[in-house]
């Protein structure tokens, strides 16, 4: 069967796999899209298994608001293929809606919420287990945050980044802040709010760099900076870092001639807090070796 450019484009849109891989998979599958998707899963899984240091995880960020209450949730799965699955997307949407309506105490409590979907139910946990069997991949609700009592502005960058801003003032300005947070990923509102462990880590890095520079200067017979100058360099590096990672001090993405704080003041808006979710942030995805897995299965079958 002749493989057309439109077929390749369609498979790429569904899987996000490289164009050449899509063409090869369609050729091997003789134009059968379902079979081509399975071929891609095997090929890409094998490649991913070789990337032992790869840090990532797949999933979707969903947001729902109703009656002044909002919910941001991250639901994880094993591969990028499933993030485009209609049933999985419907599940994430339903969970976000359920969090708004039911106000669960924690992630475990989400499983007990009422839900019927795709013939599975009557709880979220029942639907989750049913979809695992149907789709063939594990999935889990990783984290969520429910918002109530404040004006809310949100921004979703596809399904991989989600931001919610609690604010007073101009809604358009707050939405601009949400988009800015998604792009610049600050860790706190102000420099004073940056977590102590991050500050300590940055100070340690700056001190190590200063020590390295001193050793290099000494080895080359050049003057070594005094302890006082070194201390000022370290403090300067830390202060620069604090400005770079705090929302108020960052240059506003839509106008780099002013800081976010200046923009907010100009538009009479106050940001109370922001919440940023990035899919897979902080999760190390297991690097599976597909060939080794197959070999293990064959060995197990022979031993049986």
Swiss-Prot record:
The keyword Magnesium does not apply. The keyword RNA-binding does not apply. PROSITE patterns: EF_TS_2 (PS01127). It is found in: Cytoplasm. Keywords: Cytoplasm, Elongation factor, Protein biosynthesis. GO terms for molecular function: translation elongation factor activity. One of its GO terms (cellular component) is cytoplasm. Signal peptide: none annotated. CDD domains: UBA_EF-Ts. Residues 79-82 are annotated as: Involved in Mg(2+) ion dislocation from EF-Tu. Its main location: cytoplasm. Belongs to the EF-Ts family. Associates with the EF-Tu.GDP complex and induces the exchange of GDP to GTP. It remains bound to the aminoacyl-tRNA.EF-Tu.GTP complex up to the GTP hydrolysis stage on the ribosome. This is Elongation factor Ts. The lineage of its organism: Bacteria, Pseudomonadati, Pseudomonadota, Betaproteobacteria, Burkholderiales.
């Amino acid at each position: 069967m002749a493989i057309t450019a439109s077929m390749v484009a369609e498979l790429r849109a569904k899987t996000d796999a490289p164009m050449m891989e899509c063409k090869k998979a369609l050729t091997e599958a003789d134009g059968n899209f379902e079979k081509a998707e399975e071929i891609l899963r095997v090929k890409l899984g094998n490649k991913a298994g070789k990337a032992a240091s790869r840090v990532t995880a797949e999933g979707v960020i969903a947001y729902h608001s109703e009656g002044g209450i909002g919910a941001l949730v991250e639901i994880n799965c094993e591969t990028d293929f499933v993030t485009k699955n209609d049933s999985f997307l419907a599940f994430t949407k339903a969970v976000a809606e359920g969090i708004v309506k039911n106000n669960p105490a924690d992630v475990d409590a989400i499983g007990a919420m009422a839900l019927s979907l795709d013939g599975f139910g009557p709880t979220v946990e029942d639907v989750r287990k049913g979809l695992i069997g149907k789709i063939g991949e594990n999935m889990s609700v990783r984290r969520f945050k429910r918002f109530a009592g404040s004006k809310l502005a949100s921004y979703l960058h596809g399904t991989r980044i989600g931001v919610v801003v609690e604010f007073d003032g101009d809604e358009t300005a707050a939405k601009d802040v949400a988009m800015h947070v998604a792009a610049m990923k600050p860790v706190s509102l102000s420099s004073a709010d940056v977590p102590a462990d991050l500050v300590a880590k940055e100070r340690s890095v700056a001190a190590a760099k200063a020590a390295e520079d001193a050793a290099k200067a000494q080895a080359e017979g050049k003057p070594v900076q005094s302890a006082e100058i070194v201390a000022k360099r370290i403090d300067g590096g830390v202060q620069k870092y604090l400005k770079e990672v705090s929302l108020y001090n960052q240059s506003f993405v839509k106008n780099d001639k002013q800081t976010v704080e200046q923009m907010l003041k100009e538009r009479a808006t106050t940001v109370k807090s922001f919440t940023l979710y990035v899919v897979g942030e902080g999760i190390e995805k297991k690097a599976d070796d597909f060939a080794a897995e197959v070999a293990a299965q064959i060995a197990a079958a022979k031993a049986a």
